[in-house]
A protein has these predicted regions:
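Short helix-boundary/capping micro-motifs
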Residues: 12-28
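A short LG(V/I)-centered, amphipathic sequence patch enriched
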Residues: 40-57
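Alpha-helical linker/hinge and terminal dimerization helices associated
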Residues: 42-43, 64-86
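Central regulatory/effector-binding core of bacterial HTH transcription factors
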Residues: 92-151
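Flexible hinge/capping segments at coil-to-helix
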Residues: 155-169, 173-195
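Beta-alpha-beta core module
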Residues: 157-160, 229-277
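Secondary-structure junction motif
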Residues: 194-214
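A late-sequence structural motif
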Residues: 259-303
Length: 307
C-alpha cells in the first residue's frame, strides 16, 4: 500500500469530509476520492461507506487508519534517526596528499581523530609530479595540494578550496657555506651558486625561476630531485644549495642550515580541495576543521621559535 494514500485515509478519519481533506492537502476533492478508491482496491475491502450526505470509515477503514498511524510514527522515527545520523561525523573519509603535506599534518590529525566513534580516516600520498591535484577530487573526499598561489582552475572547476596554511620556503646551505653567516639572503647573494633543484614547475623550482629573473642570468642546476630528503643530503654534503620548505626541512645537527630569502615571493599555499557535495558530510567537515587547527598550531609554533 502507498504511504501517501494511507495518510489521506488518516486525514479523512480526523477531518470527516473529503472536502476538508482536499483543503488540507492542497488537491481537489475528486483527486482525494480517486486515491481513496485506489487504496480500497489495494486493501481488497471497502474502507468507507455512505453516512448521511457524506461518508464514514468502515470497521476495516478504522483498522487501517490505526495501521497507517503506526506506519507514520515509524517513518517519523526513522527520519529522525537518519537526521541524527547524518549530523554525526561517522563513516570513512578518504584523503590524499603531497608527501611533505602529509609529513607536516597527518600524524597529529590522525592522533586527534582516533577516538571519534565510527570515523575512519584513510590517507594516501601522491606523486608530487602530478600535473594538477584537483584531478584527484573525484576519487578522494579531501585532496591536500600545494601551490605558490591558489590555482584559479581549482575554483573554475567548481571545487571548494579551504586554505590551510602558507609555508615559507627558505634557502638551504651547507653549514660551511660562505653565506652561512648572513641572517637573510637576496637573489644577488645567490648569483653564481650551484643549485640542487626540484623538477620543473615544482613550487621550489618556480622560486628559482624568480631568482633567475631578478639576477638576469640562468641558475646553475647540477641535479634535480623530487625527494626533499635527497636534496637535504646533497646540500649537507656540499653539493650545492637548494630551496626547501621551512617546516619540514631537517636543519639541526646534520650539516645543513636554512636562511630566509628576501626580494622574491617565497612561500607555498597549502589547501584542502573538495567537491562541494562531499564537503557537506559532517565527517569530512570534522577532518577539514582538524586539518585547519593543526596547520595553525604548526605555523604558530614556528613563528614562536623564530621569535
Amino acid at each position: 500500500m502507498d504511504i501517501k494514500r494511507l495518510e489521506l485515509l488518516r486525514e479523512l478519519s480526523e477531518r470527516g469530509t473529503v472536502g476538508a481533506v482536499a483543503d488540507a492537502t492542497g488537491v481537489t476533492p475528486s483527486a482525494v476520492s480517486q486515491q481513496l478508491k485506489v487504496l480500497e482496491q489495494e486493501a481488497g475491502t471497502p474502507l468507507t461507506e455512505p453516512a448521511g450526505r457524506g461518508i464514514a470509515l468502515t470497521v476495516a477503514g478504522r483498522a487501517l487508519v490505526q495501521t497507517a498511524t503506526e506506519i507514520a510514527i515509524a517513518v517519523e522515527r526513522a527520519e529522525s534517526r537518519w537526521h541524527d545520523f547524518m549530523k554525526q561525523p561517522a563513516g570513512e573519509v578518504t584523503l590524499t596528499t603531497f608527501p611533505t603535506g602529509g609529513e607536516m599534518l597527518l600524524p597529529q590529525v590522525l592522533a586527534r581523530l582516533v577516538d571519534v566513534p565510527g570515523l575512519r580516516l584513510v590517507c594516501t600520498d601522491q606523486d608530487p609530479l602530478l600535473p594538477d591535484f584537483a584531478d584527484l577530487t573525484p576519487d578522494f573526499d579531501i585532496v591536500l595540494a600545494d601551490s605558490p598561489v591558489n590555482s584559479p582552475s581549482w575554483r573554475d572547476r567548481g571545487l571548494l578550496v579551504v586554505p590551510l596554511m602558507s609555508e615559507p620556503l627558505d634557502v638551504a646551505l651547507p653549514e660551511s657555506h660562505r653565506l652561512a653567516k648572513k641572517t637573510k639572503l637576496t637573489p644577488k647573494d645567490l648569483a653564481g651558486e650551484i643549485w640542487i633543484g626540484a623538477p620543473a614547475d615544482f613550487p621550489y623550482d618556480r622560486i628559482l625561476q624568480e631568482i633567475e629573473a631578478v639576477n638576469g642570468v640562468p641558475a646553475i642546476v647540477a641535479q634535480r630531485f623530487m625527494d626533499n630528503g635527497i636534496v637535504e643530503s646533497m646540500v649537507a654534503g656540499g653539493q650545492g644549495i637548494a630551496i626547501l620548505p621551512r617546516y619540514t626541512t631537517r636543519d639541526r645537527g646534520n650539516g645543513l642550515i636554512t636562511r630566509p630569502l628576501a626580494g622574491v615571493r617565497t612561500r607555498r599555499d597549502i589547501s584542502a580541495l573538495m567537491r562541494p557535495d562531499r564537503a557537506e558530510r559532517p565527517s569530512v567537515q570534522l577532518v577539514v576543521e582538524t586539518l585547519k587547527q593543526e596547520a595553525q598550531k604548526l605555523a604558530a609554533s614556528h613563528t614562536q621559535a623564530a621569535g
